[in-house]
Amino acid sequence: MSFPQLGYPQYLTAGQAAVYGGERPGVLAAAAAAAAAAAAAGSGRPTGAELGSSSTAAVTSVLGMYASPYSAPNYSAFLPYTTDLTLFSQMGSQYELKDNPGVHPATFAAHTTPGYYPYGQFQYGDPGRPKNATRESTGTLKAWLNEHRKNPYPTKGEKIMLAIITKMTLTQVSTWFANARRRLKKENKVTWGARSKEDDNIFGSDNEGDHEKNEDDEEIDLESIDIDKIDDNDGEQSNEEEDEKLEHLRQGEKESLKKESEVMIPSSDGLKPKDSMSLGKESSDTSNTRIVSPGGQGNIQVPPHSKPKIWSLAETATSPDGALKSSPPPSQGNHTSPPIQHPAFLPSHGLYTCQIGKFHNWTNGAFLTQSSLINMRSLLGVNPHHAAHHNHHHLQAHQQAPFLATNLSSLSSDKTPERTSPKHSDRENVPRTDSPPQLKPSFQAVRENTLSQQEGTSRILTALPSA
């Protein structure tokens, strides 16, 4: 029996029945029952002789669909449609196999399912799929750009409309317009004004303020746009750091100039302290200045109009020794001294003293020499010539006393310096090692003026320098 609707007009032979009959009895029985029902439906007269032949023919016809590797190992029990062969007789008349397009052979017409053909409408023609920018799609964009050359900034609504027409995405449309604006600027050097506010209020634009930005000459590539932004930011940060460094250097230079200008150079009167003014009678010349040093080194001439040097090694090397030594602690707090300044900060025409703490050190005889003591006043403002004249009156009073009272006169002469200078009474008992050799030549003139023939006067004079 044949099945023309399946396309396999095969007939069962005795040898095939003997081969497949003994191995799968259960499957053959089920297949025989199904084949008998199909034969009864087709002929309408089922007979007992036809039942056996129809069952074997149904199995062999189904197995004929497969090649020899499937039929040789006897996979008939695993075929899915062996028990449902009655369906094919009813479905065969519903399909018109003559109009089959020919992609598949006619033998598979019963098993065909609705499939998508390559390059069809639904698979590759989906409008939601992004499309590459072609000349046809960009032609619409070029036409819009030519119409809006004065203001080539489409609003968001216009971009959506152009994206629908050209089947492109909004990002592609925006990038195309950005590149087109760069090309126009490069070719024609055209600059555009501000956008109209009405379009922005209605639709809004994602390119607001593009005309204010400095656009690069190169076009934007969507793949490397993030990397380009990072590189630009790094370049801007490096430029900003260099600018900040330059600003810090300039500010430091300005501050140093301000500090130099703040170092005030006072006038010669302002530099002269009150104590040094009383000592400066000998400085009659205004061009040259004598620096009085207590170390007995004499007077040092300073050249006029010497420019001050800030922290100069040569200036510190040539400065007096007293300037490098620290001042001794003051014993009396009644007298004040001018503020100590470095010699480099002082002008050339000012009189300044050596850096020895208080003024009472100048009255100490241990630090004075013969040249410096003559022109200086004592702490009480008494000139040495006046002191010699005062001592002369005391000596005349003591000369009237007999020689037996020489000891008493020496005691009275010890009390007179206590009356004139009571603050120096505590210095009589202090031993001085350097004062006797330095004080003898300074009082030599006083001794010659008041010389007498009596021995008591010499004793009185020896007691006077101790005061």
UniProtKB/Swiss-Prot annotation:
GO terms for biological process: brain development; cell development; cell fate specification; dorsal/ventral pattern formation; ectodermal placode development; maintenance of kidney identity; mesoderm development; midbrain-hindbrain boundary development. Residues 215-225, 233-244 have a biased composition (Acidic residues). Residues 245-262, 415-431 have a biased composition (Basic and acidic residues). Keywords: Activator, Developmental protein, Differentiation, DNA-binding, Homeobox, Neurogenesis, Nucleus, Repressor, Transcription, Transcription regulation. Expressed early in neural differentiation in the neural plate, and expression continues in the neural tube after neural fold closure. Expressed in the presumptive midbrain territory. Also expressed in the prospective neural crest and the preplacodal field, anterior to the neural plate. Strongly expressed in the profundal placode and weakly expressed in the trigeminal placode. One of its GO terms (molecular function) is transcription cis-regulatory region binding. Residues 197-306, 318-344, 410-467 are annotated as: Disordered. Residues 126-188 bind DNA. It comes from the Eukaryota. Pfam families: Homeobox_KN (PF05920). SUPFAM superfamilies: Homeodomain-like. Acts partially redundantly with other irx members in neural patterning. Required for formation of the posterior forebrain, midbrain, hindbrain, and to a lesser extent, spinal cord. Acts early in neural plate development to induce expression of some but not all proneural genes, and specify a neural precursor state. Also up-regulates repressors that prevent neuronal differentiation. Patterns the neuroectoderm in both the anterior/posterior and dorsal/ventral axes. Belongs to the TALE/IRO homeobox family. This is Iroquois-class homeodomain protein irx-1-A. It comes from Xenopus laevis (African clawed frog).
